[in-house]
């Protein structure tokens, strides 16, 4: 395990104070190695960027992308700063190309540095600040905007989420509900707090923004969708601003693989999938 050996070397030299001397690490000679699982392709207009926090200030460690099969375009980065002075590492989602040299508000992973390495998680206070292991909830089938009912509509054309137990998100993130069928995912709206209307209310196929009950959901009335005909339901955590109209599948705290017909307003539970969230580590070597 080279990374472990390198991390040990870095920690040994820093403990003896050699890195502060003139014959020690010169800026630009230390390498940061990144090993992260669970990252997804952000599309052509966005990229991942690493940051070392030095005296409270972010210093970029470099930009990389991730392919559809989860492979990073780069995993080793030559540092432009003395890593001994760094306290933590943060991974953000950035526009590409990026007109702003500072980090975006979309902090995905972070970790504190100790002995030249850091474990990275979404739960770190500099990332999302929660591990989402306690996220839970249920949804019902039913019509949230009865004024939009048309001939042939039924409770199977609406999905609503009245009982969601989700933590508050930091700036840079929003929740989004989805139904996923053979033709791909369809949004049910974005929201920041579970007990509020989502961004599109009862949806464009019903009454639109500002209509429906005070919790997230969607009616598919003017273009009816039978949600019991092979659809899944999910809630993702999305970058704000969003990198793509598709689900940010790396952060999907709640999902149900099959919406079943349990009757009008019958509750169906979500499964917690936070264990699949991205995680990893960095190590710094000379």
List the model feature ranges, each with a label.
Residues 1-286:
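N-terminal targeting/export leaders
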């Amino acid at each position: 395990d080279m990374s472990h050996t390198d991390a040990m070397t870095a920690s040994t030299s820093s403990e003896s104070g050699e890195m502060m001397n003139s014959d020690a690490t010169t800026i630009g000679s230390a390498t940061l190695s990144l090993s992260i699982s669970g990252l997804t392709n952000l599309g052509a207009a966005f990229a991942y960027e690493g940051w070392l926090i030095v005296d409270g200030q972010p210093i970029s460690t470099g930009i990389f992308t991730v392919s559809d099969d989860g492979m990073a375009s780069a995993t080793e980065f030559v540092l432009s700063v003395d890593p001994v002075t760094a306290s933590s590492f943060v991974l953000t989602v950035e526009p590409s190309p990026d007109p702003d040299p500072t980090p975006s508000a979309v902090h995905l992973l972070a970790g504190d540095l100790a002995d030249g390495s850091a474990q990275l998680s979404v739960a770190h206070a500099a990332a999302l600040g929660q591990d989402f292991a306690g996220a839970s909830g249920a949804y019902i089938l039913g019509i949230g905007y009865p004024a939009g009912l048309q001939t042939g509509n039924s409770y199977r054309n609406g999905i609503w989420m009245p009982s969601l137990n989700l933590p508050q998100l930091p700036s840079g993130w929003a929740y989004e509900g989805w139904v996923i069928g053979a033709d791909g995912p369809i949004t049910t709206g974005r929201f920041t707090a579970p007990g509020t209307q989502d961004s599109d209310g009862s949806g464009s196929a019903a009454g639109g923004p500002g209509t429906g009950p005070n919790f997230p959901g969607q009616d598919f009335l003017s273009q009816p969708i039978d949600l019991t005909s092979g659809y899944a339901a999910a809630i993702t955590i999305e970058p704000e601003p969003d990198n793509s109209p598709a689900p940010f599948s790396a952060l999907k705290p709640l999902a149900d693989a099959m919406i079943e017909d349990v009757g009008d307003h019958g509750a169906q539970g979500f499964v917690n999938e936070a264990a699949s969230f991205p995680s990893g580590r960095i190590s710094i070597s000379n």
